[in-house]
């Protein structure tokens, strides 16, 4: 399942590395959390996804299921993770689970597929959250979106930064597909996405609700800033585009 297989227990990673050594790629997955809690204060690095792993490439760095929780601490880092753009393949996969990145955490060089896929279609009660408050940089998603959701609450905190990332996906850099709730309070800058930075999309499964807060800065990007699809709702309380 993964280099570390968590089943209802607690992982506290205060340091160290999971993945390939310098210049060496590991094939497979770093962390598979089937329930339980993971606190990642070390580094997940140099991992290439493979369909031979259980659940394939759904979460090459972190796979969360069964109401598990994972936090990338202020000292935590995920870097140099690659995979194949197909289906829901991604570096971080979370279904009915909570995933958090703290201020100071770093995610970089996730290339060739999605960084994160979030599915919380669970009676539409939005009981789980992806809360991003660290830095995401230098990710080249190719024909995939950087982030994609299917329902769920996704919050970009005031310390969050997404910079120097790229996507040629029809869903843009951040693709909120059906019923998601988004809060943007951080910075999105110096990115390139031909279909835009944020696509609030309803493809027949429920309108998206999004808020841009006073601390938000969506600036210096190549591509339109925000695209609002039918039955989606965007409220701008402040901030800068």
Please report, for each region that a protein language model flagged, where it lies by residue.
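Extracellular beta-strand/beta-solenoid scaffold signature
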Residues: 1-7, 22-34, 48-67, 79-96, ...
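All-beta strand scaffolds that present successive hydrophobic residues in beta-strands
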Residues: 10-18, 37-44, 70-78, 99-103, ...
